[in-house]
């Protein structure tokens, strides 16, 4: 037994609705896996490059894409944001998503320094 408990009000209900940030190689690997998992649905892809986002959405049968990360984190139809963007963007984007009330899965490294990591832990 630990002295920590799970805040059940923050536990997402299924299906988990995923937003993918980054239309590169790692996202091309993770999206098919998410699409195979019961209780998970990939809702939207984000890329800073609209053509890449549109192409990714078409390739993986996603209905929506965006080049606006602010829009993505404000989307009430998204529960989880998966960050597979250049690593220098991870901390800021994770912070933005956490502040918007989203669950976040971030590729390594989570941040470029320990202070940013501690900040993200505190927000989560």
Language-model segments: residues:
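Conserved donor-nucleotide/metal-binding helix-loop-beta segment in metal-dependent transferases, i.e.
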Residues: 124
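N-terminal Rossmann-like dinucleotide-binding module
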Residues: 1-60
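Beta-loop-alpha module in the N-terminal Rossmann-like domain of NAD(P)-dependent dehydrogenases
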Residues: 60-121
């Amino acid at each position: 037994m630990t002295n920590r408990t799970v805040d059940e009000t923050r536990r997402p209900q299924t299906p988990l609705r995923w937003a993918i940030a980054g239309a590169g190689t790692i996202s091309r690997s993770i999206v098919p896996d998410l699409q195979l998992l019961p209780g998970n649905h990939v809702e939207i892809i984000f890329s800073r490059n609209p053509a890449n986002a549109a192409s990714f959405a078409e390739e993986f049968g996603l209905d929506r894409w965006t080049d606006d990360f602010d829009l993505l984190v404000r989307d009430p139809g998204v529960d989880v944001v998966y960050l597979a963007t250049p690593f220098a963007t991870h901390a800021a984007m994770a912070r933005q998503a956490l502040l918007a009330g989203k669950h976040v899965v971030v590729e390594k490294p989570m941040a470029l320094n320990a202070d940013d990591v501690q900040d993200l832990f505190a927000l989560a």
